[in-house]
Amino acid sequence: MAANEDRDDAAAILNWEGTSEIKSANEYSRNLLFSVLDSLDGNKTIVWDRDRSVMHRVNLFAGASVLAAHGVVANHSIETKKSASTPHVVFFLAPTMVSLDLLCDYIDNVRNDSKILYQVFFIPEAWFVVRESLKTRAEGKYWERLESVKEIPLCWLPRDGECLSLSSPQIAARLLINGDWTHLHKCAVALNQLIDMCRGRSSSSNQRPMSIYAKGKWASDVAKMMGKIRNSAEADSMTKNLDPIEGLLKINRIVLIDRWMDPLTPMLSQLTFYGLLDEIYGIGMVNSVKVPEMEFKNEKDGDPFQEKEVYLIDEVYHRLKHSHINAVSIEASKVLAEIRDDEQFDRDKMSVAEYSVLVKKMPKIINRKKMIEVHMRLAEMIQSHVYCKQSDSIKLERDLLEYSDSDKAIPLIEDLIFDASPLNAVLRLISVHSLTCGGLKPSVLQHYRRIVNQSYGSSALNKVLKMQKMGLIREKGGGGKMQCEYAQMMFQQMKKNHDMLPEEFSEAKLDDMAYAYSGFSPLLCKMLEEGDRVKWVGWPKTVIGDKSDLIAERDGRGTCVFVIGGLTRSELAIIRENLPNVALITTSALITGDKLLNNITNI
């Protein structure tokens, strides 16, 4: 957790903590956590799950020093089986059977005083199956040892200071391959928590309204579930236990939209600075990337496996992240000019008061110089990767967006397969080929399948079949078991209707909807822009709360967007820069094409 404190210090110096909406949501989550800890009198020992995502999730809201201020005097890993001497042992666990096994093993093997109270908290939710298994295991032996079994619904995780994510990248695959609709219910529960952040929970039946607009099959289902949850006995029980934070988030409406209205964009190469960071290195839960240290330091000798972790939480990163990789130097030059201006001072003519101001400014100046150097090095590494390894693929993507033929295989895709290039890169291009032409001719699809099987093996072929089931690859006139239940995108028609390939665009202008993909405007973003322009007329609407009071509807601002199935960082940048009425962007996960495909492997 020391690293978490270092990140907190850096953020404080550079003064970038996110938008006011993100701060409000974070404050709500912190208070959920603190209310749990403060309800337990005396000192506490936290026993952390082996699944480090639980610790990472909690550390996004509170580091070691903050937890200590709420009575946490020791932190143990559940696998070390260390004994505790505090009145309470608090288990922070993921809601999985593996975590349940570790809990039972801890109870069996750790000889704590019988007076010590065991408090179990599943994060972010306590799944019914896990709870019931715990109750019945060993005829209730373990259940009886526990003082309480609850959940801490830390559902919404901050991303890049401008987005909230459920960190569930598997949702699209689970829905389309398994038909597991429980994931939509989890989205509905989380969105109801978002409403609580805005309106607060009250036992009064006269609640301020919240309008929900939905676009797509999943969105419509989630909107219905939200209403049912709100009106059910579950909602009634929630109003009896008010959350510690009420009404801080200023949102007037929630707009739900399916990722699968536009499955094409995640398959394309992102070209914004932080979009490419995510594509190439992967931005983790704690908003950091791990890069090869030798490459970062531009050294020829060293450990090729050594990695450097770079935290993306500072004000300089915030200034650069939305920029197109070809235009990132423009914004960087502005930051450098500001640093030079800050360093312009005449020591001989400065008063004591001016020296005092300078001393206070120096840490920020030094840190800004350090961070601009770090981020420009990352930009150099990204540009080198794009030009050396991705330029041909990016050009092919552009060609397919302009014109795509379903009757023949693409030579570049064939060459990449024969060269055993990274599988996901190949599959993404096949998907782009299929989606842009409205489905591949059966002979072309069979040819792709055959050569993929020859070069990568049966596991890769299985992945292709799952992509068919998800609708990422389609066969013209195809049906049967491989037919995707979700309606086809109809790219050629949508391209004309929404002007997705404008004749003129600028990579340097962030208010150009085509800048992030070098001339391509994502359909999902265009749909949101159109909806915002017409004030969501024509989008199915559900009102939660008192329907007689819709004063907030008159104000076009304060819109919250929730994308079910994932959102790319480049799309996030487009929405932030082009839709000023959108105050908060939320999603089931921030994704890349690779992350989307990786989540179908184990299904």
Swiss-Prot record:
Record note on disruption phenotype: Viable, and develop into fertile adults, but their progeny arrest before embryonic morphogenesis. Defective endosome/lysosome size and fusion, and delayed endocytic trafficking to lysosomes in coelomocytes. Reduced number of gut granules in the adult intestine. RNAi-mediated knockdown results in a reduced number of gut granules in embryonic intestinal cells.
Cited Pfam families: Sec1 (PF00995)
Annotated GO CC locations: apical plasma membrane; CORVET complex; early endosome; HOPS complex; late endosome; lysosome
Compartment(s) where it occurs, according to its Swiss-Prot or TrEMBL record: Lysosome; Early endosome; Late endosome; Apical cell membrane
Highest taxon listed in the record's lineage: Eukaryota
Main location per the UniProt record: other
Tissue expression: Ubiquitously expressed at high levels in somatic tissues including the pharynx, muscles, hypodermis, neurons, coelomocytes and spermatheca. Expressed in the intestine.
GO annotation, biological process: intracellular protein transport; vacuole fusion, non-autophagic; vesicle-mediated transport
InterPro entries: Sec-1-like_dom1, Sec-1-like_dom3a, Sec1-like, Sec1-like_dom2, Sec1-like_sf, VPS33_dom3b
Keywords of this entry: Cell membrane, Endosome, Lysosome, Membrane, Protein transport, Transport
Membrane topology summary: Peripheral membrane protein
Role of this protein: Plays a role in vesicle-mediated protein trafficking to lysosomal compartments including the endocytic membrane transport pathways. Believed to act as a component of the putative HOPS endosomal tethering complex which is proposed to be involved in the rab-5-to-rab-7 endosome conversion probably implicating sand-1, and via binding SNAREs and SNARE complexes to mediate tethering and docking events during SNARE-mediated membrane fusion.
PANTHER family linked to this entry: VESICLE PROTEIN SORTING-ASSOCIATED (PTHR11679)
Quaternary state and interactors: Probable component of the homotypic fusion and vacuole protein sorting (HOPS) complex consisting of the core class C Vps proteins vps-11, vps-16, vps-18, and which further associates with vps-33.1, vps-39 and vps-41. Interacts with spe-39.
Family indicated by similarity: Belongs to the STXBP/unc-18/SEC1 family.
Entry protein name: Vacuolar protein sorting-associated protein 33A
Organism this protein belongs to: Caenorhabditis elegans
Gene that this polypeptide is encoded by: vps-33.1
